[in-house]
Amino acid sequence: MRFIPKLKERFRAGSTQPAREIDPVRFRQVMSRFATGVTVITAESHGEIRGMTANGFLSGSLHPPLCVVSIAKGARMHETISAAGRFGVNMLAHSQEDVSAHFAGRPVAGLKFQFVHRDGTPLLADACARIVAKTDARHDCGDHSLFVGRILHMEADERPPLIVHASRYASLMYADDHAGTPSVEFW
């Protein structure tokens, strides 16, 4: 029973979190091991269109159709989505690394964008998939907010998505490209 006092020392009173601090650099490294698609979140407020590269995006519910985006509280996009009450999610195609870099704060000289509006929300015309969502709820999540959006509009083409893994862009390879690998149905 000697381990019980040591275990108690590791946890803060009233918390399930270990008392030690998590190194933010290491946290980012570990989280980057999860391969994910790259999106540009768009919104318009007071006549100004904003876009921000993000990979904190997920489907939230099928019934009703909801999606979730994670936005840093200090980001200009946080204020823009809050004011607009809606947002666009633009899933980038595998060839759109330059678009990702541009909206991540590394502008690409000469890069031009065409926006289309659906349900009052700007979307990148050349994204491989686009969603418009009306903000249904906002939840605090540490230094971020989770915006839950009710899907109003969605469209997609057949191009493969841009993927990021270990802080690098990656290519998508389908499992059924390997002989004998069965298809997987999640829905």
Predicted regions and their residues:
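Basic, polyanion-binding surface patches
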Residues: 2-187
